[in-house]
Swiss-Prot record:
This is Amyloid-beta A4 precursor protein-binding family A member 1. The lineage of its organism: Eukaryota, Metazoa, Chordata, Craniata, Vertebrata. Its main location: cytoplasm. Composed of an N-terminal domain that binds Munc18-1 and LIN-2/CASK, a middle phosphotyrosine-binding domain (PID/PTB) that mediates binding with the cytoplasmic domain of the amyloid-beta precursor protein, and two C-terminal PDZ domains thought to attach proteins to the plasma membrane. Residues 1-118, 235-346, 362-437 are annotated as: Disordered. Residues 658-744, 749-824 form the PDZ domain. It is found in: Cytoplasm; Cytoplasm, Perinuclear region; Nucleus. Residues 103-112, 237-255, 389-400 have a biased composition (Basic and acidic residues). InterPro entries: APP-Binding, PDZ, PDZ_sf, PH-like_dom_sf, PTB/PI_dom. Keywords: Cytoplasm, Golgi apparatus, Nucleus, Phosphoprotein, Protein transport, Repeat, Transport. Residues 628-643 are annotated as: Autoinhibitory helix linker. The keyword 4Fe-4S does not apply.
Length: 839
């Protein structure tokens, strides 16, 4: 690379005056500490020629012993720095702040191909583990700006000595480099594969004592390792803190950019970066152990230079293929190195596995690796495409705009009109991602009444029709069905009038004089389109959600679509301050009139399309349509005995009779009445108690529990309790009273059939008393009545049972549920909890 053939001064001189670290990829990644320390100083003049150390063959004066030892350590550290810079460039994700320099980097590599073996770096003692060590230093190069001053591996005053010893380097690179059109792959996915590095010895470099250099390097590395361990723990804690509630708000998710910037690299590191640091720490510990255990002879062999590899008179000879990975091929050294390498790799792999598991536990799904590609945007309604329970959800049709997929079975002119999400809307994206996972687990479709197959309605169906014309009407927001039908009839009347005027060559009203045209009426769960039968060009296109009403009148079909009228700003301000004005808002209705022999089928198909679209909506939101199937619930209701055979009981003549009560004038009847309870088939009053020795009791014709239908010809059915009491009190001056009653036991028997827990019972209980009831549910069908106290459930008395236990019994009861109830007021009277008030 051209700009790396010189010394460090060349790289500093090439920087922008502002100190921006973006002039050169290698300058940014290989010498961050040089750039940081050079920033305060003024830049050199533009015409300043950088020094070329190769132009001065005289070696530099020997430094003092202590400086010489530091210099040797810095040289070894330079080896690590250059390698980490190389990997920092190759591992940069697409779209990163350094990606702009990539083309220049490729061009420089191509130009320097001829000088590939002219320069090299000295072989490091840990060459056996070089591959893993270099990748681990990826993190170190980016973090050295944040290291304390005493932890910097080399300072600015040592740059000249280092550059005198190392004037350049050449790599043969195959690491994670891919073309634009190649599929994405994680940078470390093929770790351990073929990695070629060409090393040559620099002949005129000063002789270094490898043992002293290794000792210095190990001491500095231990200090850096301790710092990295602290940073690693802080980052793990940072992940844990960011994990709590991240998916709750889009604002928090927006804080975490997909690709980290270099100035915030330490705060947004991903799992691979942390694992790389653990690799380096483990590798360093393994190297220490290896250095202590290996004999001196083997260490000397490992540190020996490559024979014949770098003499000045043969700079163009590349290293042999067998020496690209190992410089010394001594059998003894190879076996020892392989043994230590295998032990180290086993330990590292176990540690990496533990670290990844720990990180995954504290990391939420919103924390992504910077190398992970952006997920594709998903539609608001995830339209199902041939999904079976065994098929994976990832086989969904991709969002391609409005064009159908090539393999779609949609008819000619059909569109898949899928509305894409707003870009950058993580909340809807997170919600739809979860709904997609649940789609395939649901059955294909719940049966929807209609003439079409639900699958066909998703793709779209076509009916042939004649387009008669269109007209406009003003309508309220939610008119009744009768009003809708009147509007449809008015639209048909207008169109027929316009046709008659056109035939008589008279001027028709503007917008209504349209000739009859043969069209194809396209119907799907997304939209309704009117296509020209000859050209298949769309004449009209309405989203299904805008269709307000469909009517078939003979062979005429009226399709009404809603459009909001434009309003002035003053109207909008009034409606904003008075929300009740929204109900009075006028809507412009576009009424299209068609003529077809299949008018009824067209209307039914559009209605069925709404039902299928609703099922799609449920599926997209993770709800099984079977749970809300109206047909299934209707079938369940049909299995219930209506009011537990109350109709049969009330219709039997022997249970309904007239009773005459004789009494003295001024004497009360001597009864206590209560309401039969809302939910009974005939709401009236029930005799709850009778006065001892009173006219009612002495007659022997009345019993507790009898329902009074009428008194002296006045019906009590449906009247309030207070009104019924007033009527009975008015009998005080009469000597003979006629009552029409229905014999009923004081205790009501309830039978509820509940096949599955997913069906709610449809009533609520408070302290054993039924306080509310869902109209039309299985409980009402079974005879449950509001105001009744539950006496028994499935043969078990619950009179003295706590409320919580009663609720638990009812919530978990399935199959046939038998209950016995009575009016709560009657229960209190019979148990002497209340004193009766006779009338």
């Amino acid at each position: 690379m051209n700009h790396l053939e010189g010394s460090a001064e060349v790289e500093v001189a090439d920087e922008a005056p502002g100190g921006e670290v973006n002039e050169s990829v290698e300058a940014d990644l290989e010498h961050p500490e040089v750039e940081e320390e050079q920033q305060p100083s003024p830049p050199p003049p533009a015409g300043h020629a950088p020094e070329d150390h190769r132009a001065h063959p005289a070696p530099p004066p020997p430094p003092p012993p202590q400086e010489e030892e530091e210099e040797r350590g810095e040289c070894l550290a330079r080896s690590a720095s250059t390698e980490s810079g190389f990997h920092n460039h190759t591992d940069t994700a697409e779209g990163d702040v350094l990606a702009a320099a990539r083309d220049g980097y490729e061009a420089e590599r191509a130009q320097d191909a001829d000088d590939e073996s002219a320069y090299a770096v000295q072989y490091r003692p840990e060459a056996e583990e070089y591959t893993e060590q270099a990748e681990a230093e990826h993190a170190e190069a980016a973090q050295r700006r944040a290291l304390p001053n005493h932890l910097h591996f080399h300072s600015l005053e040592h740059e000249e000595a280092m550059n005198a010893a190392y004037s350049g380097y050449v790599y043969t690179h195959r690491l994670f480099h891919r073309a634009e059109d190649e599929p994405y792959a994680e940078p470390y996915a093929d770790y351990g594969g073929l990695q070629e590095h060409v090393y040559e010895e620099i002949g005129d470099a000063p002789e270094l004592e490898a043992r002293d250099g290794l000792r210095l390097y190990e001491r500095e590395r231990d200090e850096a390792a301790a710092y990295r361990q602290e940073a690693l723990g802080a980052r793990l804690h940072h992940y844990d803190e960011r994990s709590d509630g991240e998916s709750d708000s889009p604002e928090k998710e927006a804080e975490f950019a997909p690709y980290p910037r270099m100035d915030s690299y330490e705060q947004e590191e991903d799992i691979d970066q942390i694992v790389a640091e653990v690799k380096q720490s483990m590798s360093s510990q393994s190297l220490d152990k290896a250095a202590e255990d290996m004999p001196e002879a083997e260490q000397d062999l490992e540190r020996a230079p490559t024979p014949g590899g770098g003499h000045p008179d043969s700079p163009g000879l590349p290293a042999p293929a067998g020496q690209q990975q190992r410089v010394v091929g001594t059998p003894g050294g190879s076996e020892v190195g392989q043994r230590y390498s295998k032990e180290k790799r086993d330990a590292i792999s176990l540690a990496i596995k533990d670290i990844k598991e720990a990180i995954e536990e504290v990391k939420t799904r919103t924390i992504r690796s910077p190398y992970t590609p952006d997920e594709p945007k998903e539609p608001i309604w995830v339209m199902r495409q041939d999904i079976s329970p065994t098929r994976d959800c990832d086989d969904q049709r991709p969002v391609d705009g409005d064009s159908p997929s090539p393999g779609s079975s949609s008819p000619l002119g059909a569109e898949s009109s899928i509305t894409p999400l707003h870009p950058g809307d993580p909340t809807e994206a997170s919600t739809n991602k979860e709904s997609r996972k649940s789609l395939a687990s649901f059955p294909t479709y719940v049966e929807v009444p209609g003439p079409c197959d639900p699958e066909d309605l998703i793709d779209g169906i076509i009916f042939a029709a004649n387009y008669l014309g269109s007209t406009q009407l003003l309508s309220d927001k939610t008119p009744s069905k009768n009003v809708r039908m009147m509007q449809a009839q008015e639209a048909v009347s207008r169109i027929k009038t316009a046709q008659k005027l056109a035939k008589s060559r008279k001027k028709a009203p503007e917008g209504e004089s349209q000739p009859m045209t043969e069209v194809d009426l396209f119907i799907s769960t997304q939209r309704i389109k009117v296509l020209n039968a000859d050209t298949q060009e769309p004449m009209m296109d309405h989203p299904l959600r805008t269709i307000s009403y469909i009517a078939d009148i003979g062979n005429i079909v009226v399709l009404m679509a809603r459009r909001r009228m434009p309003r002035s700003n003053s109207q909008e301000n009034v409606e904003a301050s008075h929300p009740s004005q929204d109900a009075k808002r006028q809507y412009k209705m576009i009424c299209h009139v068609f003529e077809s022999e299949d008018a009824q089928l067209i209307a039914q198909s559009i209605g069925q399309a709404f039902s299928v679209a609703y099922q799609e909506f449920l599926r997209a939101n993770g709800i099984n349509p079977e749970d809300l199937s109206q047909k299934e619930y209707s079938d369940l209701l049909n299995t219930q005995d209506m009011y537990n055979d109350d109709l049969i009981h009330f219709s039997k003549s022997e249970n309904c009779k007239d009773v005459f009560i004789e009494k003295q004038k001024g004497e009360i009847l001597g009864v206590v009445i209560v309401e039969s309870g809302w939910g009974s088939i005939l709401p009236t009053v029930i005799i709850a108690n009778m006065m001892h020795g009173g006219p009612a009791e002495k007659s022997g014709k009345l019993n507790i529990g009898d329902q009074i239908m009428s008194i002296n010809g006045t019906s009590l059915v449906g009247l309030p309790l207070s009104t019924c009491q007033s009527i009975i009190k008015g009998l005080k001056n009469q000597s003979r009273v006629k009552l029409n009653i229905v014999r009923c036991p004081p205790v009501t028997t309830v039978l509820i059939r509940r096949p599955d827990l997913r069906y709610q019972l449809g009533f609520s209980v408070q302290n054993g008393i039924i306080c509310s009831l869902m109209r039309g549910g299985i409980a009402e069908r079974g005879g449950v009545r509001v105001g009744h106290r539950i006496i028994e459930i499935n043969g078990q008395s619950v009179v003295a049972t706590p409320h919580e236990k009663i609720v638990h019994i009812l919530s978990n009861a399935v199959g046939e549920i038998h209950m016995k109830t009575m009016p709560a007021a009657m229960y209190r009277l019979l148990t002497a909890q209340e004193q009766p008030v006779y009338i």
